[in-house]
A protein has these predicted regions:
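Beta-propeller blade signature
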Residues: 32-45, 100-109, 147-150, 193-199
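Conserved beta-propeller blade repeats
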Residues: 1-14, 24-28, 56-86, 113-136, ...
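Secondary-structure boundary elements
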Residues: 39-48, 78-85, 96, 106-113
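Alpha-helix-centered segments that form part of catalytic cores
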Residues: 30-55, 69-77
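Beta-propeller fold detector
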Residues: 48-55, 114-118, 155-160, 201
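C-terminal hydrophobic structural anchor segments
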Residues: 178-201
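Short, conserved, GDST-rich strand-edge loop motifs in beta-rich repeat architectures
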Residues: 4-34, 88-99, 183-188
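Flexible internal linker/loop segments at domain or repeat junctions
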Residues: 134-163, 171, 194-195, 199
Length: 201
């Protein structure tokens, strides 16, 4: 199976991630009941809506905004064994403002929807295993790389002295190393890092 979203809607939100030429028929709806996350059977090609944008808004809206927001899923990924998935949900920002991101997880069939974080600063992420995820996000220690547990309030900075800037993150197959990069520096180079979790260096 595979997960899919409305890439026309994503194109309107963030062209670098969306598909051009695909129109969003729900463009005028902030969080439609007929659109959201779809599950695709890769053998038959059939798809079905498993989580609607209206459902997502209802689990993320509390204490986040004073007004109704138009939202979209920007990133979505299965955990290691495919039993749950995570999605980054973002609002369409007003002119001159930056979008904010909520973290939501669910079972593969769309059940057991859980809001890990309300709308705040959240960037790159990676599943560690079937329960834990890495997120570069705004948390108790400011913007840091955090280890977060699905369906709980557990959040812990990985190494506040090392992960000072946002970057793509991924674990080695044995779970002992983190591969990390950076945004381009002044000479347009991206730095690549490997970090040993046990040795903390």
């Amino acid at each position: 199976v595979a997960l899919a979203i409305n890439f026309g809607r994503l194109m309107d939100f963030r062209p670098v991630c969306g598909y051009s030429g695909v129109k969003d028929k729900f463009k005028d709806y902030n969080h439609p009941e007929e659109d959201g996350v779809f599950l695709i059977d890769m053998k038959t090609g059939k798809s079905k809506l498993i989580v609607s944008y209206d459902q997502i808004w209802n689990v993320t809206k509390e204490n986040s905004f004073t007004e109704d927001q138009k939202i979209t899923v920007n990133h979505i990924t299965f955990n290691k064994n495919g039993t749950r998935f995570v999605m980054l949900v973002r609002n369409f920002p007003s002119k001159g403002e930056r979008w904010r991101t909520a973290i939501v997880t669910a079972n593969t069939d769309g059940s057991d929807l859980y809001c890990l974080s309300g709308y705040t600063y959240v960037s790159h992420y990676s599943w560690k295993d079937d329960e834990y995820l890495l997120f570069y996000m705004d948390g108790p220690y400011g913007k840091q790389l955090y280890l977060v547990s699905d369906k709980s309030s557990f959040i812990k900075p990985v190494d506040p002295d090392f992960f000072l800037e946002d970057g793509h993150c991924s674990y080695s197959p044995d779970g002992e190393w983190i591969l990390y990069d950076s945004y381009p520096d002044t000479e347009n180079y991206r730095n690549l890092y490997i970090y040993n979790i046990r040795k903390r260096k």
